[in-house]
């Protein structure tokens, strides 16, 4: 959530920044006007409460002196009624301010390319050259079905579209991939976590999914309480410190976790209908950081490098792009997308998204730290995929396929596969 004081003191700047994210200037004008009304109501209410307290003292003095206090008592009742009315107005105006504020996205960082869609995103670097095949490479879903390690048809029978069964060596490959990722991140200083997969509404609000993106998730009720299946481990990892004040000496804090991610994929009809790219349920290894404000953008570079190192170790070609202001996620000030090469599609596809959310999530979730001078400040939060496991499996199947239909296991995964060097 944005700081209303920043908007109030930098109205035109806020309009210009949020215009690059598709926000109409009228929304900023409205929230500024409501904020001005809110502050005026607060001033008037405080004045009346001060007058009421003075009147109360005058009544007490009059009673001690056995004087008539009828007028003061009547005046105090009138003041009390006015305060009650102003409090109701204040609550209504505050609700309107909050309604707008919680739906405004984060301010983009100056280093992000300006533009409303992905066509304005900027490629930063490429790593490795895509393999040249002397045969027509198959798509990963065809490879998986031919090898009997992926079964989309039976998953559709059981659950519907965008689900899969991993079988045999396929299941083992998935497990090898995420165990390798977790081990790598542990070496980089991340503390491994196993999180809840169901979270409450406060948690979804804290990381910015609610109230704007309720249609993108699956919800249920637990003992009368609405709960959400997590769309990413970012939600439980970030909310671990919700409503807490951390010791600044502990920062930065790194967490990593494997979890299933559940997504309704609302609005994705007709896109990536085959394969492992766009699923309703998939495994993902997540990275989350809590940092001091002055360290967060440097920590974003390090987090992105941590995700890249997985692909380098697996020798999977990729490139890194900085998302345009209008293409970044709701909570992000700056996002790097890492896209891996898929030969059958002859293109790069997203496999990781690493974002610096600055103090946007921390303000919503009230995650703070106490600095060495005793001052309490909001932390900065970062999150990134390290990596999406199913998409990594897809990239391995396509990039390591052989003409005879087998798939070579990337060398770092061989120990995790019990010494197996090929599937098929």
UniProtKB/Swiss-Prot annotation:
Catalytic reaction(s) noted: tRNA(Ser) + L-serine + ATP = L-seryl-tRNA(Ser) + AMP + diphosphate + H(+); tRNA(Sec) + L-serine + ATP = L-seryl-tRNA(Sec) + AMP + diphosphate + H(+)
Assigned EC number: 6.1.1.11
Keyword Nucleotide-binding: yes
Pfam families listed in its UniProt record: Seryl_tRNA_N, tRNA-synt_2b
Localization per Swiss-Prot or TrEMBL: Cytoplasm
Cellular component GO terms held in the UniProt record: cytoplasm
Biological process annotations from GO: selenocysteine biosynthetic process; seryl-tRNA aminoacylation
UniProt keywords, alphabetically: Aminoacyl-tRNA synthetase, ATP-binding, Cytoplasm, Ligase, Nucleotide-binding, Protein biosynthesis
Keyword Nucleotide-binding attributed: yes
PROSITE patterns the UniProt entry points to: AA_TRNA_LIGASE_II
Pathway assigned to this chain's UniProt record: Aminoacyl-tRNA biosynthesis; selenocysteinyl-tRNA(Sec) biosynthesis; L-seryl-tRNA(Sec) from L-serine and tRNA(Sec): step 1/1
Domain of life, per lineage: Bacteria
Annotated binding of ATP, by residue: 263-265, 350-353
Entries under CDD domains matching the protein: SerRS_core
Main location: cytoplasm
Single GO MF descriptor: catalytic activity, acting on a protein
Chain sites annotated for binding L-serine: 232-234, 286, 385
UniProt remark on domains: Consists of two distinct domains, a catalytic core and a N-terminal extension that is involved in tRNA binding.
UniProt cross-references to HAMAP family, sorted A to Z: Ser_tRNA_synth_type1
Main function: Catalyzes the attachment of serine to tRNA(Ser). Is also able to aminoacylate tRNA(Sec) with serine, to form the misacylated tRNA L-seryl-tRNA(Sec), which will be further converted into selenocysteinyl-tRNA(Sec).
PANTHER family membership: SERINE--TRNA LIGASE (PTHR43697:SF1), SERYL-TRNA SYNTHETASE (PTHR43697)
The protein's assembly and partners: Homodimer. The tRNA molecule binds across the dimer.
Assigned protein family: Belongs to the class-II aminoacyl-tRNA synthetase family. Type-1 seryl-tRNA synthetase subfamily.
Protein name per the record: Serine--tRNA ligase
């Amino acid at each position: 959530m944005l700081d209303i004081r920043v908007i109030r003191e930098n109205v035109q700047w806020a309009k210009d920044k949020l215009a690059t994210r598709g926000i109409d200037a009228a929304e900023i004008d409205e929230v500024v006007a409501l904020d001005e009304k809110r502050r005026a109501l607060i001033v008037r209410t405080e004045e009346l409460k001060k007058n009421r307290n003075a009147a109360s003292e005058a009544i007490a003095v009059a009673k001690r002196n056995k004087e008539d206090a009828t007028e003061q008592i009547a005046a105090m009742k009138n003041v009390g009624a006015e305060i009650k009315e102003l409090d109701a107005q204040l609550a209504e105006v505050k609700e309107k301010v909050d309604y707008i504020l919680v739906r405004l996205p984060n301010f983009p960082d100056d280093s992000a390319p300006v533009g409303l869609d992905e066509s304005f995103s900027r490629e930063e670097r490429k790593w490795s050259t895509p393999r040249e095949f002397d045969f027509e490479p198959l798509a990963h879903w065809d490879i998986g079905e031919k090898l009997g390690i992926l079964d989309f048809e039976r998953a559709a029978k059981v659950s519907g579209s965008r689900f899969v069964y991993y079988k045999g060596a396929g299941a083992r490959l998935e497990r090898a991939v995420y165990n390798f990722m977790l081990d790598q991140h542990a070496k980089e200083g991340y503390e491994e976590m196993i999180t809840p997969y169901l979270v409450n509404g406060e948690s979804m609000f804290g990381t910015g999914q609610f109230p704007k993106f309720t249609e993108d998730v699956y919800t249920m009720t637990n003992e009368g309480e609405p709960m959400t299946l997590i769309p990413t481990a970012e939600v439980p990892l970030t909310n671990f410190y919700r409503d807490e004040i951390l010791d600044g000496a502990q920062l930065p804090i790194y967490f990593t976790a494997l979890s299933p991610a559940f997504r309704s994929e609302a609005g994705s009809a007709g896109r990536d209908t085959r394969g492992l790219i766009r699923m309703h349920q998939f495994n993902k290894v997540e990275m989350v950081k809590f940092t001091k404000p002055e360290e967060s953008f440097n920590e974003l570079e390090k987090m992105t490098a941590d995700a890249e190192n997985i692909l380098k170790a697996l020798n999977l070609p990729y490139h890194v792009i900085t998302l345009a202001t209008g293409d970044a996620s709701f909570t992000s000030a700056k996002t790097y997308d890492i896209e891996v090469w898929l030969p059958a599609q002859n293109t790069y596809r997203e496999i990781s998204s690493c974002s610096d959310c600055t103090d946007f999530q921390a303000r919503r979730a009230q995650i703070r730290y106490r600095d060495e001078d005793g001052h309490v400040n909001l932390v900065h939060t970062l999150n990134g995929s390290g990596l999406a496991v199913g998409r990594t499996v897809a990239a391995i199947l396509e990039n390591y396929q052989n003409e005879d239909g087998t798939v070579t296991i990337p060398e770092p995964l061989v120990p995790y596969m019990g010494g197996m060097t090929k599937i098929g």
